[in-house]
């Protein structure tokens, strides 16, 4: 059997074949259908925007699964935070934990979103950026030892959706022209620009948006103002949000109280002195403060010690300068160059019980500074569309952590990871070779990206705070070396126009995920010496290899026939060198303890331990019935479906492929919308169906690794039940400049859990059972909003 399908059972191969056959049938039908264009444009004016859509395919004929969501589509989805942006995406979801829950976090870890899951990979394996500037990684939870694998203390939610004119979503390993390399995809938040609102004949714009969301009793007020002409123009955007805890629908335990507010502003200017240069400057700022309090439990999870009170602050500052040079001469067509800076701060201050009779304050921070530049060039020569680029960035991170009053040797928590500095340099070249085959366009697109990263620790002496057994020389011996790697990432795509409006493609790409600072330098218990020869610690590994992937995808996108659009893809990805923790003992593995401090006798060390594969398919379609029946012009249907399967296997003796718990269950979305353009109103009904799933536990994180074979786990995770949910929305253009909109979400008040955020819930203790209640998603909620545009 080919290595491509190694580890897949015949049943799974059969399922994949069925999916591929179904899409192939659709392609064959499309190739023989009328190659006419869609009668109704996908980009309508604000007066005819549908209230809710499942995204339709892009018109751009480019291989791969990349979609874009406009500011109008975000409003239609009721997208008012990090998670609701992906409300109607079949294979994308936001992961996180609810306030007060211990699932995947400690008593001093903040609640909220940790990142996105795309096609089964999540959090730090999915890139996030604002205007191309990468957002910080989610912090690992080394202070809870190996149990913290794939859970995070401080997440990646540094954004306000109102600030963005577009969100680009790349599924699967990133393309060669993407400087922020990730094996799981990328989500790029694009700030609004003056060009989004101004055009010849319209030199000013003012917009005001106000809306209310009952799920967390939040109010939002946003202002967008733009002015200028063809030479000089600018924009200012401000957003303010105030809210409380997000209510659950458990009927057993209310969400713990929270009160939060956020401010965001952005301003940018464009100077276009001539036809060849377009210079832009952008400044943006985001700050959110959250106050919360919740129960704090003993180690058994059966007794509440008291109430923890937490203040979390999240800040991001950004600045960039860019020049778009478009001479269209014999050497280049365009050259885009940009420099940028970003500073982020995350501060969690928690006053919490340290025992049944004492309290402590935990200060947990994560700060980063990013400096970078990128440049990209394009030139068309005959049938060749050549492009290339260079990029470089420097990221400094700090992880301050302390407890007050000074804890005992039994309860001290060391700084979770060393401060670090990371350099990344990359470049790419790509060629699109266009060929005409009997009036059908065909293109071959080879490309390659080369990436180099160097990460090294700084100020390692901070890891010795409050330790009598550890000094700077011990930490320097363990973590003193830098982690460096160079990756060559080739890709090739073939695309063919079945009709003038429908294309099919086949592509291969290689992906890479460099080790992050938590994996390299994360530590717990390293400075402790209270347990004698039973003393153990979790340690990072500066010698980690880069996680890599091979990604194969075949798809079709465009118009099947007039009035019917489609975007479908089937994919298979295999991964190696996944990072996890392996147990070693000083007596059994002395070679692993050469640089480990002498007070430690057992380690759980980060290693490239696992390999995995994920395969699946997704399809979305939009049908405009008015194309054939004039009487129902304005009636449309949206359909989307996503299916994935995956498994992972460690290098332990006797291990086997076990279902990958980060792979989400099957999901389908069906929507029906009516838009009356003449009267300026519309309504939509959207149903979401998700299959139930139970994650499979393994013993990999508790395995003794003493020469015996690994056994199956007896841990019983909660089966997350499937559900069906209905949303209803409507809008009304009261006047040319005023629009009212609203929606009812979870109309039937369905009690349900999000699988990706609830998959490791158990019912062993009272705290576990409380976590199940806290994880229930909101019941019936509503949103109301008004938009005023001039």
Which residues does each predicted region cover?
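Short acidic/polar hinge/loop motifs at secondary-structure boundaries
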Residues: 116-117, 133-171
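Outer-membrane beta-barrel signature, preferentially recognizing the C-terminal barrel domain
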Residues: 306-328, 366, 416, 420-422, ...
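Gram-negative outer-membrane beta-barrel transporters
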Residues: 383, 435-438, 444, 451-453, ...
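A beta-strand signature from Gram-negative outer-membrane beta-barrel systems
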Residues: 153-207, 789
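Transmembrane beta-barrel wall of Gram-negative outer-membrane proteins
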Residues: 212-242, 252-293, 311-326, 434, ...
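C-terminal beta-signal and adjacent terminal beta-strands/loops
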Residues: 138-139, 512, 576, 689-705, ...
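Flexible loop and strand-edge segments within Gram-negative outer membrane beta-barrel domains
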Residues: 256-258, 276-332, 343-368, 403, ...
């Amino acid at each position: 059997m080919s290595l491509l399908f190694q580890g897949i059972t015949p049943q799974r191969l059969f399922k994949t074949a069925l999916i591929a056959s179904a899409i192939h049938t659709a392609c064959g039908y499309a190739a023989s259908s009328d190659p006419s264009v869609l009668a109704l444009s996908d980009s309508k004016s604000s007066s005819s925007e549908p209230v809710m859509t499942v995204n339709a395919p892009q018109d751009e004929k480019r291989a791969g699964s990349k979609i874009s969501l406009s500011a109008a589509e975000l409003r239609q989805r009721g997208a008012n935070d990090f998670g609701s942006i992906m409300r109607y995406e079949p294979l994308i979801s936001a992961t996180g934990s609810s306030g007060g829950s211990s699932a995947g976090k400690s008593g001093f870890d903040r609640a909220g979103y940790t990142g996105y899951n795309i096609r089964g990979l999540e959090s730090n394996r999915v890139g996030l950026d604002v205007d191309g500037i990468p957002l910080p990684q989610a912090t690992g939870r080394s202070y809870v030892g190996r149990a913290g694998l794939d859970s995070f203390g401080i997440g990646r939610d540094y954004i306000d959706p109102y600030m963005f004119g577009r969100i680009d979503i790349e599924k699967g390993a990133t393309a060669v022209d993407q400087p922020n390399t990730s094996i799981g995809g990328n989500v790029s938040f694009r700030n609004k620009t003056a060009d989004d609102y101004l055009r010849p004949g319209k030199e000013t714009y003012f917009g005001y948006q106000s809306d209310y969301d009952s799920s967390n009793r939040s109010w939002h007020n946003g202002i967008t103002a733009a002015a200028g002409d063809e030479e000089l123009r600018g924009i200012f955007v401000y957003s303010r949000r105030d809210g409380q805890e997000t209510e659950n629908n458990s009927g057993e335990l209310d969400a713990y109280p929270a009160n939060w507010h956020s401010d965001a502003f952005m301003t940018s200017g464009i100077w276009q002195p001539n036809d060849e240069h377009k210079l832009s400057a952008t400044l943006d700022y985001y700050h959110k403060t959250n106050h919360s309090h919740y129960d704090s439990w003993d180690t058994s999870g059966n007794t509440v010690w008291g109430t923890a009170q937490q203040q979390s602050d999240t800040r991001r500052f950004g600045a960039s300068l860019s020049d778009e040079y478009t001479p269209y001469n014999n050497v280049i067509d365009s050259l885009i160059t940009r420099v940028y800076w970003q500073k982020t701060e995350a501060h969690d201050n928690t006053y919490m019980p340290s025992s049944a009779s004492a309290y402590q304050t935990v200060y947990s921070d994560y700060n980063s500074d990013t400096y970078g530049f990128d440049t990209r060039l394009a030139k068309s020569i005959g049938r060749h569309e050549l492009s290339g680029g260079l990029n470089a960035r420097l990221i400094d991170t700090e992880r301050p952590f302390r407890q007050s009053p000074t804890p005992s040797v039994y309860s001290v928590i060391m700084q979770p990871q060393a401060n670090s500095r990371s350099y990344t340099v990359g470049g790419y070249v790509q060629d699109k070779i266009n060929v005409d085959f009997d009036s059908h366009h065909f293109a071959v697109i080879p490309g390659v990206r080369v990436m180099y990263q160097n990460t090294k620790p700084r100020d390692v002496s901070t890891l010795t705070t409050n330790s009598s057994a550890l000094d700077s020389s011990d930490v320097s011996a363990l973590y003193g070396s830098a982690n460096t790697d160079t990756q060559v990432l080739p890709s090739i795509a073939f695309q063919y126009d079945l009709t003038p409006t429908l294309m099919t493609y086949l592509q291969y790409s290689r992906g890479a995920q460099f080790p992050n600072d938590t994996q390299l330098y994360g530590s717990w218990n390293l400075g402790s010496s209270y347990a004698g020869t039973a003393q153990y610690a979790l340690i990072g590994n500066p010698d980690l290899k880069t996680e890599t992937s091979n990604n194969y995808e075949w798809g079709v996108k465009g118009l099947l026939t007039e009035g019917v659009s489609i975007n479908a893809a089937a994919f298979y990805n295999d991964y190696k060198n996944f990072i996890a923790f392996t147990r070693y003992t000083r007596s059994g593995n002395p070679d692993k303890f050469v640089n480990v401090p002498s007070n430690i006798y057992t380690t759980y060390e980060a290693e490239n331990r696992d390999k995995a594969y994920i395969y699946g398919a997704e399809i979305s379609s939009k049908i405009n019935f008015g194309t054939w029946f004039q009487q129902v012009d304005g009636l449309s249907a949206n359909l989307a479906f996503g299916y994935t399967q995956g498994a992972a296997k460690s290098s332990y003796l006797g291990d086997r492929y076990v279902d990958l718990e980060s792979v989400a269950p099957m999901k389908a979305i069906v929507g029906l919308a009516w838009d009356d353009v003449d009267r300026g109103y519309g309504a939509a009904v959207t149903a979401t169906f998700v299959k139930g799933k139970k994650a499979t536990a393994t013993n990999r994180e508790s395995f003794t690794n003493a020469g015996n074979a690994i056994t199956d786990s007896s841990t019983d995770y909660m089966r997350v039940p499937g559900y069906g949910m209905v949303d209803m929305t409507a809008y009304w253009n009261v006047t040319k400049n005023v629009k009212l909109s609203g929606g009812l979400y979870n109309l039937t008040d369905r009690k349900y859990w999000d699988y990706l955020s609830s998959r490791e819930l158990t019912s062993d203790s009272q705290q576990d059972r409380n976590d199940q209640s806290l994880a229930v998603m909101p019941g019936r909620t509503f949103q109301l909003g008004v938009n005023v545009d001039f």
